[in-house]
Regions:
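Short glycine-rich, low-complexity segments
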Residues: 1-91, 98-142
Length: 142
């Protein structure tokens, strides 16, 4: 195994620390009105399209093989697999993630490339060798 499997805290788990920051950013984004343009808006820079993001999608890579993690999901009666996830919760060296599916609506895929599924899983971050952050986006999570 890649790391000490008895590690139950995120003290020595750098991936958990990174994912905790992502979860906090995602939670914080839900508390703001994205259309605000005053001094108290929660972001810097211009907002020409007035798009407010609430998700930083991630992918995980196996520690031993370096291959991309995938997880099965069912959406609208069709089953598939995805390698793109939204981290929802981190506890110790484990993360609970939601599987994100490719957006089938080609007219909005440039602004919202993923849609949420109702498939969740918990991953032991000691088994993950690397994670990759994808461009921030908006996911209509309930």
């Amino acid at each position: 195994m890649c790391q000490d499997q008895n590690n139950t805290t995120n003290e020595n788990c750098c991936l958990a620390n990174i994912l905790e920051v992502i979860v906090k950013l995602q939670e914080r984004s839900e508390k703001f009105d994205c259309l605000g343009d005053g001094c108290d808006r929660p972001f810097l820079g211009p907002t020409p399209a007035t798009v407010c993001y609430n998700t930083r999608p991630v992918t995980f890579y196996h520690c031993s093989s370096g291959s991309l993690w995938t997880f099965p999901y069912t959406l609208n009666g069709s089953s598939d697999v995805s390698s793109v996830f939204r981290c929802e919760h981190v506890e110790g060296c484990c993360a609970t993630c939601r599987v994100l599916a490719p957006n089938p609506d080609s007219s909005t895929v440039s602004s919202t490339p993923y849609i949420p599924t109702e498939t969740f899983f918990t991953i032991n971050l000691n088994c993950v060798g690397a994670l990759r952050c994808l461009p921030d986006t908006f996911i209509a999570c309930s």
